[in-house]
From Swiss-Prot:
Keywords: 4Fe-4S, Antiviral defense, Iron, Iron-sulfur, Lyase, Metal-binding, S-adenosyl-L-methionine. This is S-adenosylmethionine-dependent nucleotide dehydratase. GO terms for molecular function: 4 iron, 4 sulfur cluster binding; lyase activity; metal ion binding. It catalyses: GTP + AH2 + S-adenosyl-L-methionine = 3'-deoxy-3',4'-didehydro-GTP + 5'-deoxyadenosine + L-methionine + A + H2O + H(+). [4Fe-4S] cluster binds at C16, C20, C23. Residues 1-239 form the Radical SAM core domain. It comes from Fibrobacter sp. (strain UWH6). Its EC number is 4.2.-.-. Its cofactor is [4Fe-4S] cluster.
Length: 333
């Protein structure tokens, strides 16, 4: 398996100013080890030695996740500074409510991922993506992203959208195209903590309305054409889809207390803390599917999701069904 970058997701904090109803980043307020710089250094030094069987990579990327990691700006800066000094590529996932907080050090970040499920205020309130009744609007997000790009012209922008019972009818693809993002990841809500996921109908309805790669602007049309010509599975796609099966046991994740953890079961499975054992030993204590990991960064899973959607709506049985049309009941905003 040849991949350029291995990505490790460190959920450094559980604290968040939103209360998303489907959130899986719950650890019942465990001790967060990033409050101690020595622990942060131990974790990062441990991660530097990561090796995966039959997997070659040239770069390690630390993806800082929460909770909402941006809320504790100074502490976040200390982690980023330390990771940068150890030659990690650095990315971050945020709900976007305080993107301005990372402006002083965004030049050290290669990718900012923003979790956006809707641009409709009422929908976001129903989901729990609000703080004291305030939600982020499309125009606010656009302006914040433009400011970050001004400070770091090479910054990649990714949007993560979780398809759930409140937003499955919305058409977001045109707004995403207007933002000129580098990647749009569409994820299916995971069953977790006694909460059910969403039905095949709802997930496939969202895909039918939004899985339209042709609408997304490309940074480099020529390289995209050449990649598509030589290897269709590696073309420069912007939209990536992750169904529940693709999302399970395919991420390398660290909990706030420093343990590797893995999904795919009714409860998380954990390793011993990375402050106590090596990363190799920790990987032996959890299930991690390297093939799934690799496939998430290609578009195999996306093509499969598209095929399943077409099959679900019996589109392959009728030649006159056009995948390019939009359902009439989408978001009007």
């Amino acid at each position: 398996m040849n991949i350029k970058t291995i990505v490790i997701n460190w959920h450094i904090t559980e604290s968040c100013n939103y209360k998303c109803k489907y959130c899986f980043a719950k650890w019942n307020r465990v001790k967060e080890i990033w409050t101690n710089p020595d622990n942060v250094r131990k974790i990062l030094e441990n991660l530097k030695s990561i090796r995966l069987e039959d997997c070659l990579f040239t770069q390690k990327r630390l993806n800082i996740v929460g909770g909402e990691p941006i809320l504790q700006q100074e502490r976040l800066w200390q982690v980023i500074k330390m990771a940068h000094e150890m030659d990690f590529e650095i990315s971050i996932i945020t709900n976007g409510s305080h993107l301005e907080y990372i402006c002083p050090f965004v030049h050290l970040i290669s990718q900012v991922g923003v979790s956006i499920d809707s641009f409709d205020h009422k929908t976001n309130v129903r989901i729990g993506r609000e703080c004291n009744g305030k939600t982020i609007s499309f125009q606010q997000l656009k302006e914040k992203l433009e400011e970050l790009r001004t400070l770091n012209p090479g910054l990649n922008i990714k949007i993560n959208t979780v398809v759930n019972e409140y937003n499955f009818n919305e058409i977001l693809v045109d707004r995403m195209a207007e933002l000129k993002i580098d990647k749009w990841k569409i994820l299916r809500q995971l069953p977790f903590d006694g909460k059910e996921g969403i039905s095949d109908f709802k997930f496939n309805t969202f895909l039918f309305n939004n899985l339209k790669e042709e609408k997304m602007p490309k940074k480099d049309p020529l390289s995209n054409f050449l990649a598509a010509f030589s290897a269709p599975q590696k073309q420069n796609n912007v939209i990536f889809v992750e169904d529940n099966d693709v999302m399970t046991e395919s991420y390398l994740m660290i909990a706030p207390d420093g343990r590797l953890f893995q999904n795919g079961h009714k409860e998380y499975e954990y390793s011993h803390p990375l402050t106590e054992i090596s990363i190799d030993e920790a990987l032996e204590e959890i299930n991690f599917d390297q093939e799934k990991f690799n496939n998430r960064y290609e578009n195999y899973a996306t093509e499969e999701a598209k095929y399943r959607m077409e099959e679900f709506f019996l589109m392959n049985e009728y030649e006159d069904v056009s995948f390019d049309c939009c359902c009439p009941f989408g978001d009007k905003d």
